[in-house]
């Protein structure tokens, strides 16, 4: 139904407002309550441990509209939870409020839910429609779904390169400065990306040559900075605030998820990036290419010839490519 899709798009837009690091390990979820083709309530999950989207949606209903709730339709991007966690079961809350119809975007693969939320609603006599804009709803919850379905963080690779596909000149010491590719604007975009990830990893050579802070200081709108990891199979005397990641493997990624790293940003260097590509452990790749800079030789960037970007932007004369496995 076209009207169902219209209201589900609104729920998706609400879900996108959520700060990823505020809700993790929970998903981003949005909800809209509609009575006779009029929106009477909206909400989204804002922070882990606080009200879910369905609760916030119904709490937003004006007092004069509360009698309309039993005759309304709720649109929610993810299946309502059926279990008692930090917050009460949303499915049972909807049953208690007498909601007539619920339209669900996608199912929740969490073993504690996984169809149970919809079953509870149906058993109580609520009409349930599932799969409305399913792929779009899965997209907005992609970090959570990757955690649940693949048992690892959502992994993003990022690098900047010259027009002839080099990451940097060959350097031997920190005194030799790296080639500066990023503009103030693209640097801000990188720091915004950092703020959305709960972990960030670099290789040993990057740490030794660049001593990166890996904060999101150029994106002050978010208070979240990722947990820092060094990829090294050898013992390293790390400064406080760093942790060691010994390998790139499904097992090591599962370990990160158990350490509450729900999304991981891989910033380099070349060997570290290739390790994730060769292990086929990635979900998104961002490449900043500077068309007016050629190096001729140096540290070669990973090859993505077999992949096709799903988005290309131009900012300050730089080409920004995104490769994404999720639709």
Language model features with spans:
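Zn2+-dependent cytidine deaminase-like catalytic core
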Residues: 9, 33-137, 275-277
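A structural motif shared across PLP-dependent enzymes of the aminotransferase-like
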Residues: 23-24, 28, 49-52
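Short acidic, glycine/serine/threonine-rich loops at helix termini
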Residues: 87, 114-117, 141-143, 167-172, ...
